[in-house]
């Protein structure tokens, strides 16, 4: 495994751990300023909207988020890379409401900025 691939795998691990811990600032630091998230049935989401949603979810009384990412492939080409993974997410709302579980694949494009890999584009196919 190359150093770049290891750094990308570490980014995904950090993302998952920070999301589950409600550490929005760490998650935001793992993405580029021009990041775009693509989700079926919705308009593309930019960093500002992602940040607002993530902060609301991480606030006291927000849902509990659990997840697991299984990276299937990582390819690096200079300062760009992509990965595809299988993602499982469970969101448990406060107050005893039923949890929502989703799973599916993601395709993620990363860009290396100032020596660090950051998420630049993400297509989430969870159902």
Predicted features along the sequence, with ranges:
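Feature marks short, surface-exposed loop/turn motifs that line or immediately flank catalytic pockets
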Residues: 34, 91, 126-127
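Generic short beta-strand segments
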Residues: 85-92
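Short beta-strand edge/turn micro-motifs at domain boundaries
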Residues: 103-127
């Amino acid at each position: 495994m190359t150093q770049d691939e290891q750094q990308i795998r570490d980014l995904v691990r950090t993302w998952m751990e920070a999301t589950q811990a409600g550490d929005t600032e760490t998650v935001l630091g793992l993405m580029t300023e021009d990041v775009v998230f693509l989700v079926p049935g919705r308009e593309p989401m930019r960093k500002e909207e992602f940040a607002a949603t993530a902060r609301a979810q991480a606030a006291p009384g927000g849902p509990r988020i659990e997840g697991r990412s299984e990276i299937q492939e990582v390819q690096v080409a200079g300062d760009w890379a992509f990965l595809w993974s299988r993602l499982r997410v469970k969101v448990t709302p406060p107050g005893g409401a039923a949890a929502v579980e989703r799973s599916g694949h993601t395709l993620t494009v990363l860009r290396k900025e100032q020596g660090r890999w950051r998420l630049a584009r993400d297509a989430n196919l969870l159902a």
